[in-house]
């Protein structure tokens, strides 16, 4: 044989399994000294050299062999053509050369197309994207399915390539096609845990309610395969990204969807479009997405919206029916608070000790509820930012609110300490009054302990909010 194989680092073959080394793809490197054809060779030897040149990606030798008469549609074991192999390893230049030499971009073997091979190739997303783009430019059909009825977009979604998915849809791929098990591209992405692909498919109009043959939606498939972030994302009441790009022309879609960051190693956590924030999520969940532009024009944040009074709704042009939806949602979201009722008129001399004690007990209980609420928030917060499913507002907004909370708690602590000192002063004066006869109740220090406990609770709440503030700043 004119080209001896020199064993070295392994190079991916064509994926076939063979019983003899002579029938399949060789794994290895060509001897560099034997790459030039110095004399005519038998066809069988040329085919072997051709396979090895494809294996090593030796484009110059491939071109030389094609010039010598080797067919660009040569059929190797299992019926694979050179283009099929080049696509399987995402060798962009080799795919380009073979296509320029007349290779059939629509070739298929047992319903396995070159395009499907490229979408499921071993390689980086950038390489796969370029190969797919080349094949589509030569009229490869993005909707031809394999024997399992899986289309190229399903393979791209399964393997986690959002830009390939976007390109296929831009070239006419059916985003909601289903395979033999009822899986769509969205179902495959949810099953494999590819959040960036899920977001991209939602932008492109994927229907998240389509069920598999066993009756499961993509969100249920994600939950079954232990992908809680995707499960939460797909469980939103409405889909704010659905159909976002359907009105664009093909050229506009390609231009927008193929815009990518120059950092190739970047984790595509979100799509190339800005992800939706907390205000959008709240509005879409209530079916009030039409209010998004209005609120943004008036620079109304979610926090502002949730604290608006009824007259403010009208001033900002919010319709009565929309007001009712927001107020109903606020009623559901509102944390039950302990109402103090009418505070005792402490200035009056006839105020009873029981009334005043009741007020202090309610204040202490309220502080306890607040401490529990903050503890729950700290427990539930993700430990790292990449675990957050939906985009948050600037962390500065959160830390500023925490700073206000800490300041208010410090003020509250200071006022409670003043109250404690005042009560203690009154108590001391009363004890020193020679005309005063202490009652049995006064002999017991339990009321004093309650006051001390209230003061300690308030101080503890202040410390807890300080820790919460540090946690937000660190995130």
From Swiss-Prot:
The keyword Magnesium does not apply. It is found in: Cytoplasm. The gene is ASZ1. Keywords: ANK repeat, Cytoplasm, Developmental protein, Differentiation, Meiosis, Phosphoprotein, Repeat, RNA-mediated gene silencing, Spermatogenesis. It holds the Pfam family Ank_2. This is Ankyrin repeat, SAM and basic leucine zipper domain-containing protein 1. One of its GO terms (cellular component) is pi-body. One of its GO terms (biological process) is male meiotic nuclear division. It comes from Loxodonta africana. PANTHER family: ANKYRIN REPEAT, SAM AND BASIC LEUCINE ZIPPER DOMAIN-CONTAINING PROTEIN 1. Plays a central role during spermatogenesis by repressing transposable elements and preventing their mobilization, which is essential for the germline integrity. Acts via the piRNA metabolic process, which mediates the repression of transposable elements during meiosis by forming complexes composed of piRNAs and Piwi proteins and governs the methylation and subsequent repression of transposons. Its association with pi-bodies suggests a participation in the primary piRNAs metabolic process. The modification Phosphoserine is found at residues 17-18, 20. Interacts with DDX4, PIWIL1, RANBP9 and TDRD1. SUPFAM superfamilies: Ankyrin repeat, Pseudo ankyrin repeat-like. Residues 272-334 form the SAM domain. Transmembrane segments: none annotated. SMART domains: ANK (SM00248).
């Amino acid at each position: 044989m004119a080209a001896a194989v020199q064993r070295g680092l392994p190079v991916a073959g064509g994926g076939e399994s063979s019983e003899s080394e002579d029938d399949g793809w060789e794994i290895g490197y060509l001897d560099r000294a034997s790459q030039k054809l110095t004399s005519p060779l038998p066809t069988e030897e040329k085919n072997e050299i051709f396979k090895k040149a494809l294996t090593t990606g030796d484009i110059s030798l491939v071109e030389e062999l094609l010039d010598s008469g080797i067919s660009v549609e040569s059929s190797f074991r299992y019926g694979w053509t050179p283009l099929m192999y080049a696509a399987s390893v995402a060798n962009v230049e080799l795919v380009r050369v073979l296509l320029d030499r007349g290779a059939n971009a629509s070739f298929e073997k047992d319903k396995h197309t070159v395009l499907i091979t490229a979408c499921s190739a071993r390689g980086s997303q950038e390489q796969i994207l370029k190969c797919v783009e080349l094949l589509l430019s030569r009229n490869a059909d993005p909707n031809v399915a394999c024997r399992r009825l899986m289309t190229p977009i399903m393979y791209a979604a399964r393997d986690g390539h959002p830009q390939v998915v976007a390109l296929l849809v831009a070239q006419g791929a059916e985003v909601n096609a289903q395979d033999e098990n009822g899986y769509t591209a969205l179902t495959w992405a949810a099953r494999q845990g590819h959040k960036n692909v899920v977001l991209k498919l939602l932008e492109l109009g994927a229907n998240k309610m389509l069920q598999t043959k066993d009756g499961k939606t993509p969100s249920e498939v994600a939950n079954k395969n232990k992908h809680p972030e995707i499960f939460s994302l797909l469980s939103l009441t409405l889909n704010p990204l659905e159909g976002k790009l359907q009105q664009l022309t093909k050229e506009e879609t390609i231009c927008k969807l193929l815009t990518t960051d120059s950092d190739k190693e970047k984790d595509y956590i979100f799509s190339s479009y800005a992800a939706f924030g907390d205000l959008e999520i709240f509005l879409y969940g209530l079916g009030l997405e039409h209010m998004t532009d209005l609120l943004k024009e008036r620079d109304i944040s979610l926090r502002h919206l949730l604290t608006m009074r009824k007259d403010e709704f009208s001033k900002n042009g919010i319709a009565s029916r929309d007001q009712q939806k927001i107020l109903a949602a606020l009623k559901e979201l509102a944390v039950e608070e302990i109402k103090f009722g009418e505070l005792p008129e402490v200035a009056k001399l006839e105020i009873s000790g029981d009334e005043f004690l009741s007020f202090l007990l309610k204040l202490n209980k309220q502080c306890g509820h607040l401490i529990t609420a903050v503890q729950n928030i700290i427990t539930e917060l993700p430990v790292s930012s990449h675990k957050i499913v939906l985009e948050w507002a600037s962390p500065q907004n959160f830390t500023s609110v925490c700073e206000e909370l800490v300041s208010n708690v410090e003020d509250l602590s200071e006022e409670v300490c003043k109250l404690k000192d005042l009560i203690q002063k009154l108590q001391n004066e009363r004890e020193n009054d020679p005309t005063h006869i202490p009652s049995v109740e006064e002999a017991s220090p339990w009321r004093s302990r309650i006051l001390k406990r209230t003061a300690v609770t308030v101080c503890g709440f202040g410390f807890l909010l300080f820790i919460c503030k540090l946690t937000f700043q660190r995130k």
